[in-house]
Structure formats: structure tokens, C-alpha cells
Amino acid sequence: MRMGTNRRLANVKTRHETGLDYIMQSMNLNTPFGKKQLKELKPFFPGEEEELKKELDRVESMVSFVNGNSRTVEHIQELFMEVKDVSYTIARSENQTLAVVEIYEVKSLLLAMRKLLSITVKDGKNLVPEDYILEDTTELLDVLDPGKDRINTFYIYDEFSDKLKELRAEKRQCEIAIRKEQKAKREELKEKYGIMLTPKFDISVSKSSPDLEKISGIPELEAADQDYLSVTFQLKPTETVYEYTKRMENLNGELEEEEERVRKHLSLEISKYADVLTANCEKMGALDLAMAKAIYAISHDCVRPEIADEHVVEIEDGRNLQVEDILKSKGKKYCPVSISLKDGVTCITGANMGGKTISLKLSGQVPILTQYGFFVPAKKARVGLSNYIQMLIGDSQSVERGLSSFGSEMEELKEILDHGVDRSIILIDEIASGTNPVEGLALTRSLVDYLIKKPYISLITTHFETVTETEGVVNMQVKGLADADFNLLNREIQYANRRERINIISKYMDYRLCRVEKQGEVPKDALNIAKMLGISSEIIEGAKKYIK
């Protein structure tokens, strides 16, 4: 696991909006160690490309392992489900005497480690990368399991101490002697009074029974319990039973002391292996996390990203995993998107419903997943590491804070610009859409002028087409309905209700991006969509007059 850096790549909102949190929450981890490592996972930064490549090597190895060893993977996962976090117990063993249940937990962990080692190493050959191979802890297991039964139970066994064995043997003899004395007394009462005591050496008599007075008068019995229906009598202890019972009380005290001495010894033995156990737990967690990464990559058709030295994000047929999962649940297909970004400003233009925001999030999802050592949802991807990735989208709790959406947006923009550094990725969705169009356009153009001079990859979605006229700005447009068969679309939508119409239009939308080298005819997707959703022709035709 990657540790030791407190640098922040992205804030909480960006992690959420790019889908990083969603993906991490969707991963199936089974050990407390793996879950902890996922929660504490740190990203790789520029200058750490070689370390990241090694991490991706490990994930790639695990992908091959998972693909070729499905049954073994199931065994490991089943084993991991039974593993408990005993880190606190291991730490306690260094200065305190562990309870029996705590020693049992350590033994259970050792058995799991032994089984995992037998699964991951066959005939002297490692089936998983060396980083995940546990150190052998058989010596400690032998200490806790002197009989070498390798059963997942624990008891302070006689093998731990000769004195313990002797005390328990004497106690058993006392119990046998007491039992023998009680049985003899039971037979005596049977012959003398004609009554038969139970195997527990008692008898229950109804309060309405004529025998109650007779049995109450038997000197060898005493009342032990009663309710409104009956009275239970039990055998009085004889002098012999009393002596053996007294001896057993003394033996119990000696046994308690000896068992504590054994537990103290076992705790000390466990403490000697504290570092090894802790390291093995880390390896189990790392294997759990690597398997989860691999399984997620396989199930979601993710690929290993190529790590570039230069600051770029190149995505071929990329997919936003969260949106794709939603579409799959509805039986719909996701339209993959390709985009190539480098330092400078790129603007995505097009109508609403065109998927601009999804493409923006995808452009953040791929690099942030890469820097956390994940495979990415694309046919191919090439990523140069960033120092900072931030996304500005939505109104960020403006209602709770009493701010307008525009005011909140400006606060977020200030934070992003204040923290921007070399090799940053800045993702901005529809900036200044919450204010009047004249000022909104002016602010957007000025922001583009500012960002184009910075060593950032800046990607902005906008309705303001003229923003792309700035020299050096790359203009990407959503293809939308440009290639749609409107005759077919109109026939299909003619008798549909409102919800069905939106779904039908979405089906015909082409969400892929195309680069616009020269500003030509303004796209009319918004007018086409408005018309198909029932806006009057008079309004649509009137709107066309204002489009230049």
C-alpha cells in the first residue's frame, strides 16, 4: 500500500463528481485490512511515474491471476471473509496478558495465514506477486496449537503445562469421587425409602401429593427450589462430598493461577511475532485490494493506462462508469467518447442533453483513477500525472449557506484558481450560467484568456459559442443529432408521451465529440429537441431568425 504523503490531489467534491468515490464504494473488499488500505489510498504525483508503473504491473499481474484462477480466487475471497482485525490484540500482547478469546483470535488469524500461504505458493512457485506472499508463521502457530490439530478452536490445553495437566487430573478424580459417593447415596435412599432420584440427584414432588410430608422428613434430602405447584428436593452433601468439594475449590484457584501464567507466556510469544503478524496483515490487505482492483477492471472492461512524461490526457472510447452502470440497469447502452487534452484550454459546446457534463466528468475520471493506481474505463488511455485535479460543477450547497448559485460558483472558482499549480487539470461545467448572458459571456471569455496562459489542462463546457473564437482554444462539439434520421425519429416520437419522447431522443443522440477547426454553422440541436418535445413551430421558426 502507498503511504506517507499528505498531498491532496483533489477535494471531496471532485472525488465525488469524477466518480472516484462511487468506484471505490463499488469495489468488493473482504478483509478489514484491505478496506482500511482502500480508505487510506494515496495518489501518485509527478515524479513518481516509475512507482505508479510498478503498481499497475501488480494490478496487471492480478488481472492475469484472476482470469486464470477463478476457483482459487473464490477460495481466497472465502478465506478473507472470515478474517478479523486483531491489530489491537497484537499490540496489547506486548505489555498485557491476553484473554482466552483474544488468543483464539490470533490462532484463527494464523490458521488463515497458513491457508493463504498454501493457496498462493504451489510447489515452491508464487502464484501472486512477491509483495503479497506472507511470511511463514508456523512456529507461532505450533506454540498456540501444541497438538498440531490445526482446528479453528482454542483452549488452554494440558500440553501447555505439566502442572496444569496434574491439577486438572486431580480435579477430575475429585469429580469422579463425588459422583461415586452421590450414586451410592442415591441407591441407599432407594432401598431405604423407596424413592428414585434423577441423574442430577434431585426429586420434584407435587404440593398436592401425599408423599410430600414423607419426603420432607427424609434427613438426607433438602429443599432446593419450589413454585406454586411443586417442591424440588436435592441430595445433601455428605462429609466425603464436602471434603472433595473443598479440595476442588482449592484446585480451581490453583488452576486459575496456572492458566493465567500460561496465558501470560502465550501473550509474550505472540508479542515476539508482532512485527511479522502486522506485516502479514498488511500483505493480506494489499492482496485483497489488488484483487478487488483486478476484479473490478475485468468486470467493467477497464484497461491499463499508459503513463506519459508530458502532461496529457488522451482517451479513446472512454466510459463514465457511474453513468454506464445506470444505463445498464435500464437496459441501455453507453456511447463511448474519445478526447485528447494537453496544456491549454479546450471547450466543449453543444445543446443540453448532449452529454457535455458526462464527457467533462469522464475527462476527470480517467486521470484521477490512473493516479490512484486503477485501470481505466476506455479502449485505450494515455495520461501524464497531475499535481492538482479540480472540478467546478453545480451550486455546492448554496441553498444551505444562503448563497446564490452564482455566488457559490465564484467562491469555488476562486479556490480552484488560488490552488492551481504546474500540471493541473481544471474542469469547469457551464461557468457563469447563473447570471445574465452578457456578463456571463464576458466572464467566461476572460477566464479562458486567463487559463490559456497557465500550465494547466483546462476543459470547459459552455453554451457560449464565441468563447471558442479565442486564439489557441480547442473547440470540441457533441455530434448530437447531426447524423440522425429525423424522419425515422419523428415517426417514433409522434405518439410517445413526455418521458418516452426524452428517452427516444436520447437513443438517437450521438454523444461522441468532434473537433471543430473553424466556426461554421451554429448547431441547432437545441431547436430540434425543443421542436420534437412539442414547442410550437412559430417559436422555433422565430428563434431561427436570431441565429446568425
Model feature map: region roles:
Residues 188-232, 240, 244-248, 482-509:
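Charged, glycine/proline-rich intrinsically disordered loops and linkers
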Residues 58, 85-89, 265-266, 430, ...:
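A general alpha-helix detector
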Residues 300-301, 308-548:
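ATPase nucleotide-binding head domains, primarily ABC-like/P-loop NTPase cores
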Residues 1-171, 283:
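Conserved amphipathic alpha-helical "coupling/scaffold" segments
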Residues 67-71, 265-273, 346-350, 430:
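Glycine- and acidic
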Residues 274-308, 314-323:
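Amphipathic alpha-helical domain-onset/packing element
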Residues 135-194, 226-275, 282:
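Extended, charged alpha-helical coiled-coil/arm scaffolds that mediate oligomerization and mechanical coupling
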Residues 94, 189, 292-303, 372-379:
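Active-site phosphate-binding and catalytic loops of NTP-dependent enzymes
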